[in-house]
Curated annotation (Swiss-Prot):
UniProt entry tagged with the keyword Cell membrane: yes
Name of the molecule in the record: Aminopeptidase N
Organism encoding this protein: Manduca sexta
Biological classification of the source: Eukaryota, Metazoa, Ecdysozoa, Arthropoda, Hexapoda
Catalytic activity from the UniProt record: Release of an N-terminal amino acid, Xaa-|-Yaa- from a peptide, amide or arylamide. Xaa is preferably Ala, but may be most amino acids including Pro (slow action). When a terminal hydrophobic residue is followed by a prolyl residue, the two may be released as an intact Xaa-Pro dipeptide
PANTHER family linked: AMINOPEPTIDASE (PTHR11533:SF290), PROTEASE M1 ZINC METALLOPROTEASE (PTHR11533)
Residues noted as binding Zn(2+) in the record, renumbered to the chain: H340, H344, E363
Details of cofactor binding: Binds 1 zinc ion per subunit.
The encoding gene: APN2
InterPro entries registered for this protein in UniProt: Aminopeptidase_N-like_N, Aminopeptidase_N-like_N_sf, ERAP1-like_C_dom, M1_APN-typ, Peptidase_M1, Peptidase_M1_aminopeptidases, Peptidase_M1_dom, Peptidase_M4/M1_CTD_sf
Needed cofactors: Zn(2+)
Length: 942
């Protein structure tokens, strides 16, 4: 399942630390309540569904489950949810005429247990079949089987589809709804003739096994391979498709389904998807197992996409590319999501997790390969360079004491959905990337080949992965200090990550001391967690960044380790963690930071681009954390005036955004704005608004960073040009802005409060059915500074007649929160007042957590904390587990921001005054001009 879910659940990565004994007892109690008893298991399901999208309340179904008792039993416990059980029969192969069913109970709590009691004991290992007739409710939150709609020629068209991961197959049919309890599935869907496109995981059968039913067309599908319940999928619609039958790149039938009239937007998915499948098959040395691949784009979908085996379902914006409308970023995201889901065909489908405790075995590998395997077929996208930026971002959520580790026991449905978070995705993917480099890429690949072949169609635990990787390592000449299982168990069962502090043992020595400790945002907290940390380095006298295998290991058993670095005595500077392949931060002695600033400002291209990004990111975050003086971070940042590569700018941008937030309202804020305008001036001239011939694929991202800083912080040329572009578009619809700068152009044109511009863009939103364009407009509309229009926009979240789909409504709040400090405060008041109305009107499970997590990144003061207190007082009784975790994250971040201001605001102000305040020489701003810029910014923003 792609990361639109986990991005909204970053807060759910946080938990309440318990003692070992408390944790163990709690887990035992939860397991007893929620985990199915290991007294029987399924081998085969025969599911019949009667689905009419025109009837939106419920559907009828029946299922026959062939089971094997492990012991003699007199009751069978499975899962069922949100359904009425009409009849149950239990029969054996030995005597199929004897019905052993006595009675049943269906739990009304979130255990969702259906307990079937029998008239007598049934014997261990004797196959039996459970027959159940039921009526199930369509899900109203897009988790389960649900009805979606779209507009076509002025009329509303219905379709039915599904999202069963992680615990919602039980809403489609009674089943053993745990990932390890795999079986073969036979599916038959009866649908009205008006719905011609009916799909499931396998192709339709050529023979007929089931009777016809009046008023329905029967669609019988071939039996699946052994698979988990959560991978079953359905689509009943009028969709059309394009396919690879005429010119196949990939030898298996490959189709892309979408709304009628959108088939031209599916061409990229068809081409890229096939190319990527070939690359993954070659890498894994294991063929895709199913006889077809369908990709379907549906208008309403809870996740970004879902890897159902043979029928992968996507949100439209995650699959369809419309030339001239889809941005470079969205197109890249579509490629990455396609690769993510393709990867799951091996990591998740072919080899699945033993339980959702090991969600990272699915999502961590999918996160890694969505970048690594996209790089195979689109190297110009620089996905593995961009991966480092994503890793730096996840450091933020992984730097709190309460964060859960990769392997984290979960039992309840809410706990399980909470595992689909930044830890399971981006952190796990980052640790896997580190694993690849410390094993070396080819040995790592060989280990994965062994893993997939050894565990095909089975349920795996991390230990199974480690055994396979160890075998590949043992068959090579490469050595590491401890077994894979020892090293990886530390990384997967401990939350957080280390910071290494490296300093020379003596001025002329050829060695360094390296100390590790857990990196925590709140330094008043402590942790004894330690790791086996692979390290490598570059010194100024021997600049080689290409070999990323370990040159040494920092062991968890020693507080500090002396590491020999030959040639260091003759080196001006040194860098640890080549290409930032290790999942950790690095701090240095002050002399080395000064030397790094010097080399960056004199000849930055000597240093690998990923290490330039690492140095910038580490420096600002270590300064934020009180481990480094801000002067050192700012001196390093000066080199960015000369930096023409996107990646270091992408690393710097979050630090600049953080300082923008915490300095807002401070005496130094206008100096800070001038510092950024000065820093970005060369790239503003170089990039401008217009695309140039031969630009890199990632240049649009770079342009957006530079233009955003300049338009937001008062560069009149930037603001005027943005307004000119929008006005030209208003005058002539054929002069549509370049999609890559549309959000920036629209947002900049709204900041002045122009009502006409807002209404123009809102009417654009109402008039488009393209999901990419809708996303751009939703992101921009929150930028308005007009109070009446902003309130109108926020109220679209709770307006039952709003044109904004529920799955997108959280974007309204996110847009307003991110627009400006004023917008954030208005949005905070709105959420405090209306949380009980927002919660049922945004996407279930993720909408409100997405909003709260956006606040977590922006709330900084004690006044904000008081508002959160009010939110809790008024609405705590309806908070979900994810919402509670997000509130905890908000409080922690506010406390950290207050502490930052107390410790660092004066330091930052002094540096800015010394370097950008009057009178400080050639680079300084005169007092009069500073006043003018301050006045203009104030007028423009208000």
């Amino acid at each position: 399942m792609y990361s639109l879910i986990f991005l909204a659940l970053i807060g759910a990565a946080f938990g309440v630390p318990l003692s070992t004994n408390e944790d163990s007892t709690r887990n035992q109690n939860l397991a007893a309540l929620y985990v199915l008893p290991q007294t029987s298991y399924p081998t085969f399901y025969d599911v019949r569904l009667f689905i009419d999208p025109g009837y939106t309340e419920a559907f009828h179904g029946n299922v026959s489950i062939r089971i094997i008792p492990n012991i003699n039993i007199d009751q069978i416990t499975i899962h069922a949810m949100a359904m009425r059980i009409d009849s149950i029969r239990v029969v054996s192969d030995v005597n199929p005429n004897e019905d052993l069913f006595s009675d049943f109970t269906l739990a009304t709590d979130d255990t969702h247990l259906l307990t079937i009691r029998l008239t007598r004991n049934i014997t261990a290992l004797q196959p039996h079949v459970i027959h159940i007739d039921y009526v199930a409710q369509y899900a109203d939150d897009m988790f389960g089987v649900y009805v979606s709609t779209y507009e076509e020629n002025g009329r509303t068209v219905n379709l039915v589809t599904s999202q069963l991961q992680p615990t919602f197959a039980r809403r489609a049919f009674p089943c053993y709804d745990e990932p390890a309890l795999k079986a073969v599935f036979r599916t038959t869907i009866y649908a009205p003739a008006a719905y011609a496109t009916v799909r499931s995981n396998t192709p339709e059968r050529r023979d007929s096994l089931k009777p016809n039913e009046p008023g329905y067309v029967k669609h019988e599908f071939e039996d699946t391979l052994v698979m988990s319940t959560y991978l079953i999928a359905y689509l009943v619609s009028n969709f059309n498709y394009i396919e690879n039958s005429q010119n196949p790149i990939y030898p298996i039938p490959f189709r892309v389904y979408s709304r009628p009239g959108t088939q031209n937007t599916a061409e990229f998915a068809l081409e890229f998807g096939q190319q990527n499948m070939i690359a993954l098959e070659e890498y894994t040395e294991f063929p895709y197992a199913f006889p077809k691949i369908d990709k379907a784009a549906v208008p309403d979908f809870a996740a970004g996409a879902m890897e159902n085996w043979g029928l992968v379902i996507y949100r439209e914006v995650a699959l369809l590319v419309r030339e001239g409308v889809t941005t470079t970023s969205v197109k890249q995201n579509i490629g990455r999501i396609i690769c993510h889901e393709n990867t799951h065909m091996w990591f998740g489908n072919e080899v699945g997790p033993m339980s959702w405790t090991y969600t990272w075995l699915n999502e961590g590998f999918a996160n890694f390969f969505e970048n690594y395997a996209t790089d195979f077929v689109r190297p110009q996208w620089r996905m593995m360079d961009q991966f480092v930026i994503a890793m730096q971002n996840v450091f933020q959520s992984d730097a709190v004491l309460s964060v859960n580790p990769m392997t984290h026991p979960v039992y309840t449905p809410s706990q399980i959905i909470g595992t689909f978070n930044a830890v399971a995705y981006q952190k796990s993917g980052s640790v896997i990337r580190m694993l690849q480099h410390f094993m070396t890429p080819e040995i790592f690949r060989r280990g994965l080949v062994i893993y997939i072949k050894a565990n095909s169609r089975a349920a795996a635990a991390p230990s199974d992965l480690y055994v396979a990787l160890q075998q590949a390592l043992d068959e090579s000449s490469h050595r590491i200090p401890k077994p894979i299982s020892t090293i990886m168990t530390e990384w997967s069962t401990q939350g957080g990550f280390p910071v290494l502090t490296v300093r020379r043992t003596a001025p002329n020595a050829d060695s360094v001391f390296v100390a590790q400790e857990r990196y925590l945002t709140d330094r008043s907290l402590t942790s004894t967690d330690r790791w086996h940390v692979p390290v490598n380095w570059v010194i100024s006298s021997n600049v080689n960044f290409s070999d990323t295998s370990p040159q040494a290991w920092i062991l968890p058993t020693f507080p500090a380790t002396a590491v020999d670095v030959p040639g260091l005595s003759n080196a001006d500077w040194y860098i640890f963690n080549k290409q930032q392949t290790g999942y950790y931060r690095v701090n240095y002695d002050v002399e080395n930071w000064v030397a790094l600033a010097r080399v960056l400002n004199n000849s930055h291209e000597i240093i690998h681009v990923l290490n330039r990004a690492q140095i910038v990111d580490d420096a600002f975050n270590l300064a934020r954390n009180g481990r480094l003086h801000y002067k050192n971070a700012f001196e390093i940042s000066r080199y960015l005036e000369m930096e023409k590569d996107y990646i270091p700018w992408a690393a710097a941008n979050p630090a600049f955004n953080y300082l923008d937030i915490v300095l807002s309202g401070a005496n130094s804020y206008n100096l800070y704005r001038y510092y950024l305008l000065n820093l970005t001036a060369p790239m503003f001239e170089d990039l401008g608004f217009d695309v140039k011939s031969g630009e890199e694929f990632v240049t649009p991202y770079h342009r957006n960073i530079i233009l955003d800083i300049n338009c937001r912080f008062g560069n009149q040329r930037c603001i005027s040009r943005a307004q000119e572009i929008l006005q030209a578009f208003k005058n002539n619809p054929n002069q549509r802005p370049n999609p890559d700068i549309q959000t920036l152009v629209y947002c900049s044109s709204l900041r002045a409060g122009n009502v006409e511009n807002f209404n123009f863009l809102w009417n654009m939103y109402l008039g488009t059915s393209d999901s990419s364009e809708q996303s751009i407009l939703l992101s921009a509309l929150g930028c308005t500074s007009n109070a009446e229009r902003r309130n109108f926009y926020l109220n679209q979240i709770i307006d039952d007649n709003s044109a904004v789909r529920e799955q997108d409504r959280h974007s309204i709040a996110v847009s307003v929160i991110n627009s400006s400090p004023e917008g954030m405060n208005v949005a905070l008041d709105f959420v405090v007042e209306n949380f009980h109305r927002i919660q049922p009107r945004v996407q279930a499970l993720t909408g409100t957590t997405n909003i709260l997590n956006t606040f977590a990144r922006r709330l900084t003061t004690s006044a904000h904390n008081e508002k959160i207190d009010e939110l809790v007082r008024r609405h705590e009784s309806i908070f979900s587990a994810g919402e509670r975790a997000s509130i905890a994250a908000i409080r922690e971040n506010i406390a950290a921001s207050i502490a930052w201001s107390n410790s660092n605001a004066g330091i930052v102000e002094n540096w800015l005054k010394e370097n950008y305040g009057p009178p400080s020489g050639a680079k300084s701003l005169t007092a009069g001009l500073l006043v003018l810029i301050s006045l203009f910014v104030a007028i423009f923003n208000h």
